[in-house]
């Protein structure tokens, strides 16, 4: 088991001879303290819900009544419900577990099978828990959130479920053999938090214990040890963080021979302390930088640096991955090995451990290269990953790191159906499963390009288009981006994009802008706080490059993003309105004056800054769309979507922006799903509907009709 970091998308004339030179519109003046739409933050208030229903009805009338919409929704649902999807599994004991939703099982089945059976084209599954049945019995809309097993017997699990897909969960102890919840077992009431096994009769619990027990970010401030048979109120306090911390948590590493307890204190999003909790409940801090990501696997401490680290007479470079023996490190006898050091074009995408090896997955210009490290008495030695493909987005994960050197490998790109293979390090993997072609990719191609941002930075982007694309500036184009929280956007097979967009004549573009993790920590840090504008300049640069290459033009360009990507496209609409015709803004942040007071918003101040500090608000206000939208400017047509049950990014952001733009007379539509959490949908049917609405809107705006 690894202790992992805690941590989730108009110009009227155009010169075709040269790139566009477009200057972003300036930010609006400081907002007045009185917010006339703050009442829309009352998530389930009668007045607010009535307002939502009225906007939903308008969006439905505009976007969902045609035969084309109904066919698209049906096609997307068929993809999402398809039995031909890959049932990805995780190994626990001798069984391989999977959670599955389809047309019949809307809320889903938690099920298992054997490896021998899983290798068959149509495996037989043993159902362990039926979420539809449970929801019906309890008159709740339960959404699966995961399960953790008690080792080494694997007979008990702690199951997390949530109402409507919210981040707040309920945890219940479950008996595998009887396929039932344990009467009188461990059970945690609904809150943002968790239970984690220590042993059969003890768990760590971090949850809402009452007033003062949660951080400003809305997560647990206190972690306790809870003994079976005692009330939750009697649990022993292990650690208390500060009110201003992001969260605290405790974990038990149950790897045989390496058993230890750990406490993690996340001071901020990119700042945490990791402690060893000894048998006397004493905390021993692991003396690695707070800004580094720290994890432990089978006695090896891995340190992933976000900043340069001066230690002794050495300087370890930001973006590097370091390995050392934890026991030695704790007593100052460590020998630190640099197992990866970045170059200007490379970054560590991920790493993991099998029993005897480490697997490194490196991005080079947003393309994967996988290598293996073998533990030897002389240190970690690099070897090629046998069977790793030269092209495609590659993901490799250990099957059971305490027992074997087996791994799962997935390979995908925008046009090639995803494959799942299994192998042992040193041997070529065997393909187990492959998606069918959910859309006809014949005549389509993937290409990578680089735009030049305002400060000269090269910004990569991927484009999916017809091989015979006419470079006349008249192609309906959808540009997607995120640009935050170290998230890298890599090519992957997206059947809904293929079915709804690229096979219909649309061009699909994904921008790898700063703020993401495509080039490591420096790429992310280049767009933090007062440098946030660089992410938006990068996105604008990609749009201008598409114009310069005559792929599209402002009246044919739409953009889409969700969450932080919703903030991105909200800013592109308000700061660069002449570049775009249509905007799909999903589960967004938009009111950056109050974001830190809404739900989990305080946890993101390391990314955006603190609006309560005047010096920081002075730059935050420049990328707060809610405060920068004005009446006398022409903006792109916008569709806002969100979820009532989103308890991470408050639906008030989208609600208030919609209300303000609507009152100012701009062309806006709004749809709010009553369930769904931050993902926007609680089941496949809702997901198909929400995606169909977005594509229906984009087609109307960019094709001039719902389908070509």
Go through the PLM ranges and name each one:
Residues 50-149, 160, 247-266, 270-306, ...:
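Non-catalytic accessory segments flanking enzyme active sites
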Residues 111-114, 172-176, 220-229, 274-279, ...:
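Beta-propeller blade signature
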Residues 220-266:
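Polar, glycine-rich mid-to-C-terminal structural blocks
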Residues 162-163, 207-221, 305-316, 487:
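Short, conserved, GDST-rich strand-edge loop motifs in beta-rich repeat architectures
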Residues 497, 503, 510-708:
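Active-site-proximal cap/loop segments of hydrolase catalytic domains
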Residues 125, 176-188, 230-242, 277-286, ...:
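Blade-edge beta-strand/turn elements of extracellular beta-propeller
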């Amino acid at each position: 088991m690894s202790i992992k970091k805690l941590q989730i998308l108009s110009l009227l004339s155009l010169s075709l001879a040269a790139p566009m030179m477009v200057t972003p519109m300036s930010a609006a003046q400081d907002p007045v303290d009185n917010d006339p739409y703050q009442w829309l933050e009352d998530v389930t208030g009668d007045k607010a819900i009535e307002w939502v229903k009225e906007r939903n009805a308008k969006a439905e009338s505009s976007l969902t009544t045609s035969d084309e919409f109904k066919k698209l929704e049906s096609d997307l649902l068929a993809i999402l419900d398809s039995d031909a999807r890959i049932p990805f599994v995780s190994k626990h004991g001798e069984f391989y577990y999977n959670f599955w939703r389809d047309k019949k099982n809307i809320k889903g089945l938690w099920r298992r099978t054997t490896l021998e059976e899983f290798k068959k084209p149509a495996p037989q599954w043993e159902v362990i828990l039926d979420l539809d049945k449970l929801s019906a019995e309890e008159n709740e809309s339960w959404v699966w959130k995961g399960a953790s097993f008690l080792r080494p017997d694997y007979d008990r699990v702690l199951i997390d479920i949530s109402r409507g897909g919210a981040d707040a969960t309920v945890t219940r102890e479950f008996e595998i053999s009887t396929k039932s919840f344990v009467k009188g077992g461990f059970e945690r009431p609904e809150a943002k938090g968790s239970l984690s096994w220590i042993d059969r009769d003890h768990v760590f619990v971090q949850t809402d214990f009452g007033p003062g027990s949660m951080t400003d970010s809305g997560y647990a401030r206190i972690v306790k040890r809870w003994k079976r048979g005692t009330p939750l109120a009697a649990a022993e306090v292990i650690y208390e963080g500060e009110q201003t911390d992001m969260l605290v948590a405790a974990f038990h590493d149950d790897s045989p021979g390496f058993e230890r307890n750990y406490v993690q204190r996340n001071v901020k999003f990119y700042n945490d302390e990791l402690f060893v909790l000894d048998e006397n409940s004493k905390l021993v801090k692991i003396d690695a930088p707070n800004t580094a990501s720290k994890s432990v696997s089978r006695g090896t401490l891995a340190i992933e640096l976000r900043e340069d680290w001066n230690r002794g007479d050495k300087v370890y470079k930001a973006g590097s991955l370091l390995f050392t023996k934890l026991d030695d490190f704790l007593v100052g006898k460590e020998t630190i090995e640099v197992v990866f050091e970045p170059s200007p074009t490379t970054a560590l995408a991920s790493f993991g451990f099998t029993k005897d090896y480490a697997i490194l997955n490196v991005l080079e210009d947003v393309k994967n290269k996988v290598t293996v490290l073998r533990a030897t008495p002389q240190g970690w030695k690099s070897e090629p990953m046998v069977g790793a493909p030269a092209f495609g987005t590659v993901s490799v994960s250990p099957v059971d790191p305490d027992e074997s050197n087996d791994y799962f490998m997935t390979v995908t790109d925008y046009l090639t159906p995803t494959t799942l293979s299994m192998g042992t390090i040193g041997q070529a993997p065997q393909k187990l499963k492959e998606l069918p072609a959910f859309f006809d990719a014949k005549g389509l191609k993937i290409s990578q390009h680089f735009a030049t941002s305002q400060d000269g930075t090269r910004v990569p982007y991927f484009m999916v288009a017809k091989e015979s694309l006419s470079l006349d500036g008249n192609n309906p184009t959808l540009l997607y981006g995120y640009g935050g929280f170290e998230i890298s956007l890599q090519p992957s097979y997206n059947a809904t994009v293929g079915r709804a967009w690229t096979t219909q004549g649309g061009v699909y573009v994904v921008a790898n802008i700063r703020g993401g993790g495509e080039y490591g920590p420096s790429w992310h840090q280049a767009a933090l706080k007062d440098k946030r504008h660089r992410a938006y300049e990068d996105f604008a640069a990609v749009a201008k490059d598409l114009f310069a290459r005559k792929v599209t033009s402002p009246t044919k360009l739409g953009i889409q993003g969700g969450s932080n990507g919703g903030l991105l496209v909200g800013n592109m609409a308000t700061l660069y309105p002449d570049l775009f015709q249509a905007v799909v803004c999903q589960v967004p942040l938009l009111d950056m004056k109050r974001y830190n007071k809404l739900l989990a918003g305080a946890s993101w101040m390391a990314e955006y800054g603190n609006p309560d500090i005047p010096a920081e608000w002075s730059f935050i206000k420049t990328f707060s769309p809610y405060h920068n939208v004005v009446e006398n400017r022409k903006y792109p047509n916008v569709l806002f979507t969100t979820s009532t049950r989103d308890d991470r990014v408050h639906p008030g952001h989208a609600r208030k922006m919609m209300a303000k733009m609507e009152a100012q007379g701009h062309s806006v539509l709004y749809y709010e799903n009553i369930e769904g959490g931050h993902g926007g949908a609680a089941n496949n049917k809702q997901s198909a509907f929400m995606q169909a609405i977005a594509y229906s809107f984009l087609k109307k705006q960019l094709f001039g009709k719902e389908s070509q």
